[in-house]
Structure formats: C-alpha cells, structure tokens
C-alpha cells in the first residue's frame, strides 16, 4: 500500500499578473499627492469622486506603495458578488499577489487562507466585511470602497457592527492607514472630514 501526501492549494486560483500600465491624469496625480501628505499626519483619508473619476487607480497606487514596503493590504468591498468588474481589474494588475476571501469558503479554504495571512505570505486580501476578522501579521492599509454602502453593516447574526467604522479601529491596532472612497460619502464620514478627523480629498 503506497501512501502519498499531496499539497493542494484551496485558495481561489487567480491569473498571473499582466502588464497593465496606466497614466494618472492631472486630477488623479493631485489627489494621490494629497493622500500621501494626508497619511503623514492622519490615519484616515476620504476620497470623494464621482463614478468613473478614477478612484480605483488611486487605490491601486496606494496598494503598490504599501506592498513595496512589506505591508499587507485589506481591500473591503460591500458585496463581492456585485463588484466583478473591480475584482477583475485588481486581479489583472496584481495577479497571484491578491486573494479573495468571502463567507462562502468551506472550512478547509478558510484555514488555508487564514494561515497564509497569519504568516504574511498573502499580501493583498480582497473581501467583504467578514475579512476584517482575518489574522493579519503586518497590516499597513485598509481600503474601504463605496464606504457609504449599507451592506457594510451587519445586523444579524451577532456581532452587530459597521465594517467601515470597525476598519478604522482595527487599523489603529497596527498603526495602519485607512483609505475610504465614495461618489456619495456617508453623512458620518463627511462629518468626520469636516471636523478635521479625516482628510477629505476631492477627485474631479
């Protein structure tokens, strides 16, 4: 009887990184510079830009920066199943360096991705609100895309929380930064920006 042990990677297979180059326009370059300056002084930056204004490109540039510094990045989306276009764009740009995490994983898949995040092997995690509970080793940045979306709030089952607000607290444990974005910022986030708690960057 021959017994063999075979290693199986259960994490969702992603395409290899493709050469996807893009040039930022003047407004994007200005906004990116404002984000960099903001992170020197504050933990949270809110990007207000209309749909198709180029917020995703700003997220990609910031992700690149933090990963190059050896940090891990968590990219939060309100609903994984409804954001296929953004996921595809990130996959094409980062390839196998990014992993998707969601509540439909079975136990074996959860354990595998959990361990790879805990050891720091995985650098970029894309997920819905439940991804906040992953055991990051060296978290540097949390991106909260469409921060106004009510899907970030969990009512039932417990625990009840807003992933957007929880992200700010979780980031503080790592001395990490939070980059929020929306075409229609939530009242709470806009208020925090007006009170100078967050930095507000407008992308036109």
Model-assigned labels for residue ranges:
Residues 66-73, 95-97, 197-201:
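Post-Walker A helix-loop "phosphate-sensing" segment adjacent to the P-loop in P-loop NTPases
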Residues 56, 141, 148-204:
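Post-DEXD/H (motif II) to motif III coupling segment of the RecA-like Helicase ATP-binding lobe
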Residues 72-84, 103, 203-204:
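Short beta-strand-centered segment that lines the nucleotide-binding/catalytic pocket of NTP-utilizing
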Residues 1-77:
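Pre-Walker A segment
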Residues 39, 133-140:
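Short basic/glycine-enriched coil/helix segment immediately N-terminal to the Walker B
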Residues 89-97, 101-125, 136-139:
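Conserved motor-coupling elements within RecA-like helicase/translocase cores
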Residues 70-73, 97, 120-124, 138-141, ...:
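Loop/turn-to-beta-strand initiation segments
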Residues 127, 144-145:
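Hydrophobic residues in beta-strands of the RecA-like P-loop NTPase core, especially within AAA+ ATPase
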